[in-house]
């Protein structure tokens, strides 16, 4: 019986629920620990002219206060995000400009408040707008994509559709959103005085990525940094690379070699140090003939970026391959501001881009007088519109049809604002979802026979709470042809074979391919009865067959929305997602992934918004009381199913990525359902009751 496809409880579950799983801040090291707290800027732009640390240094338990004038020097300061305590420049409010090392966390936090800082303050700019004077076209956008694409002629198609078809030309916006994983970013690190060797217990999605990124910054070889991350309490992309807090801890460890330096980023600092989803605006232009067949697709996107480091969401990229049209144009703009650097947040680019594109498709369906599902089906491409390659598998239409049957789509009100259930206005919405399949190159795995039919499998992957530990055990079992109980898996350590980041929905595909490669080499060399100690290491090989195809995971989201006709209160009693992701490794955890992603989409539609004070430059919603995310009462009935399939071209396991597609398109399904319930067409997220008040019925 195959282990892959078997619904399996999390192997790390008992350790987590009994409190024995150690997270980054809980690790111990040589001697008594030292606690770090940063000193941060209170201006958004300018320079530090002086720092009086005398009162802070005199506090009980304080061991040191580091500033730009006495901190250890970094070897490479070319990456501005990592230039911590090296100069006096201030590029955003909340930037680390110093740090306190103390015997307790409380002493460190108190002492940093006593550091007196003087500034030369300069005017700052944190106001995002599409007509910003510094807007520019980036050379590349997130994911390595070209910023622009063009096929055919948009102008004539739009002009023809104005008189002989239908046109949608609207703009859609998404706000800043901040990652809030259950475990905030945290590091415990010590510098070996006999080294140099830096050991870091880091809450990261990429142990090897942390080591390779920080090594040149610190003047070390990659092998001189060991990063250990056996358990990580969520990340959503924000832990995909090191940030300022990693450099802070490294500086502290260099200053006090032999001592374990500990720092857990506070919830408030999560809104400054570790990246966020930037604001976006998407202008969508759709042209169709009278029957709704698309003749042109245009998607122009503006993304907030930072003067610290460029990061541009690839919001227009999904529109390059989603639907068929002979004339297509996509374009990206960046707006640099005096803000911290944005970074990955679950489905960067795809999430805001799909919201815009899928609401626009709903608008086109209404203009054409078509059912929104039928419009999508009629524009489903036979081959990839961008590359012309055939699909490895494209079953979006099957997802839409299956979802319609399960959800009861035939009961959808044909006319917006036409169904009532007491005081509640009821509507249904649908949206398509797509997320590119990715296998990152370079991951390696080691397999060792331990005797008695047992095997040890080692790979430097990391489980960020998604079930990787369990899934890779199932993959290894099938790769070796043994029961899952015969596998002992080791992950989360740079002492293990190299592994790529847990990001881009690529983890299982990348690491699993390495395990299959190692297992194949192991069996070829040692057969089915290997001697104890037999060992093989191999890297995931190239997949030239896949290069002939375009591989994307697809899905369809359905939502029921109820809006209070008196107050505009919005409730979402039902959501359903149907997905096509190839073979499912562990149904139990992949369903959890889907539902988590759909909850993300619900949150994006109705709740999440980071509010930045333009006067001072900082986010004021710096806690989970002011920054709203869904509660159980908001997410009452969310279900996810998937098609039974194997993608023989994508990976040796037949899998495609599953981690992020749940929150691609789900926000659009909710917003489209709001329109169906009320007649209100909302194009700016999040949707609150005040946006609906003018659309509520006058006569009750």
Residue ranges of model-derived segments:
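Conserved catalytic cysteine-centered active-site region
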Residues: 87-89, 221-229, 255-266, 273
């Amino acid at each position: 019986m195959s282990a892959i496809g078997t619904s399996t409880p999390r192997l790390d579950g008992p350790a987590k629920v009994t409190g024995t799983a150690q997270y980054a801040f809980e690790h111990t090291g040589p001697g008594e620990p030292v606690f770090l707290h940063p000193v941060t800027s209170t201006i958004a732009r300018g320079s530090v002219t002086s720092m009086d640390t005398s009162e802070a240094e005199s506090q009980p338990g304080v061991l040191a206060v580091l500033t730009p004038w006495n901190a250890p020097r970094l070897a490479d300061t070319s990456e501005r995000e990592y230039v911590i305590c090296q100069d006096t420049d201030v590029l955003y409010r909340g930037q680390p400009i110093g740090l306190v090392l103390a015997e307790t966390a409380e002493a460190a936090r108190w002492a940093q408040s006593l550091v007196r800082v003087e500034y030369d303050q300069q005017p700052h700019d944190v106001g995002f707008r599409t007509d910003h004077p510094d807007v520019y076209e980036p050379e590349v956008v997130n994911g390595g994509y070209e910023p622009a694409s063009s096929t055919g002629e948009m102008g004539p198609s739009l002009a023809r559709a104005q008189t002989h078809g239908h046109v949608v030309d609207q703009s859609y916006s998404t706000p800043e959103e901040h990652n809030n994983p259950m475990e905030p970013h945290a590091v415990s690190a010590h510098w070996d005085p006999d080294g140099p060797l830096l050991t870091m217990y880091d809450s990261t999605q990429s142990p090897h990525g942390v080591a390779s990124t920080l090594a040149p910054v610190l003047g070390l070889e990659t092998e001189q940094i060991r990063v250990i991350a056996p358990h990580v309490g969520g990340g959503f992309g924000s832990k995909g690379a090191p940030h300022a807090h990693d450099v802070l801890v490294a500086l502290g460890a260099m200053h006090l070699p032999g001592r374990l330096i500990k720092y857990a980023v506070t919830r408030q600092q999560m809104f400054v140090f570790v990246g966020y989803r930037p604001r976006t605006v998407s202008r969508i232009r759709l042209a169709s003939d009278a029957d709704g067949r698309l003749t042109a697709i245009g998607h122009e996107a503006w993304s907030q970026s930072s003067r610290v480091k460029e990061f541009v969401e690839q919001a227009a990229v999904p529109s390059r391959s989603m639907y068929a049209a002979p004339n297509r144009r996509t374009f990206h703009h960046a707006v640099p501001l005096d803000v911290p650097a944005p970074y990955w947040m679950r489905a960067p680019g795809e999430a805001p881009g799909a919201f815009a594109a899928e609401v626009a498709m709903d608008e086109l369906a209404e203009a054409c007088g078509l059912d929104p599902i039928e419009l999508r089906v009629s524009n489903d491409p036979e081959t990839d519109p961008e590359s012309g390659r055939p699909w490895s598998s494209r079953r979006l239409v099957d997802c839409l049809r299956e979802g319609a049957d399960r959800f009861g789509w035939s009961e959808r009100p044909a006319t917006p604002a036409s169904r009532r259930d007491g005081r509640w206005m009821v509507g249904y919405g649908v949206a398509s979802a797509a997320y590119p399949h990715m296998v990152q190159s370079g991951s390696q795995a080691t397999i060792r026979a331990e005797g008695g039919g047992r095997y040890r499998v080692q790979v430097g992957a990391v489980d960020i709470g998604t079930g990787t530990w369990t899934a890779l055990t199932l993959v290894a079992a099938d790769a070796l042809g043994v029961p899952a109980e015969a596998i002992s898996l080791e992950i989360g350590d740079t002492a293990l074979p190299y592994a790529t980041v847990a990001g881009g929905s690529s983890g299982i595909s990348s690491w699993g391919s390495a395990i299959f490669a190692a297992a194949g080499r192991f069996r070829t060399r040692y057969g089915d009865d290997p001697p104890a100690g037999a060992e093989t290491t191999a890297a995931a090989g190239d997949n030239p067959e896949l290069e002939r195809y375009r591989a994307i995971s697809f899905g369809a989201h359905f939502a029921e929305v109820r809006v209070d006709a008196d107050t505009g209160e919005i409730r979402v009693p039902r959501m359903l997602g149907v997905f096509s992701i190839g073979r499912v490794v562990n149904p139990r955890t992949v369903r959890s992934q889907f539902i988590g992603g759909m909850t993300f989409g619900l949150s994006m539609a109705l709740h999440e918004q980071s509010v930045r004070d333009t006067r001072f430059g900082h986010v004021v919603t710096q806690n989970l009381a002011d920054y709203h995310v869904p509660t159980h009462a908001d997410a009452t009935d969310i279900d996810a199913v998937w098609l039974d399939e194997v993608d023989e071209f994508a990976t040796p396991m037949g899998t495609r990525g599953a981690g992020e597609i749940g929150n691609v398109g789900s926000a659009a399904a909710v917003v489209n359902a709001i329109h169906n319930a009320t007649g209100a067409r909302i194009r700016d997220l999040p949707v609150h009751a005040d946006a609906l008040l003018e659309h509520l019925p006058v006569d009750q």
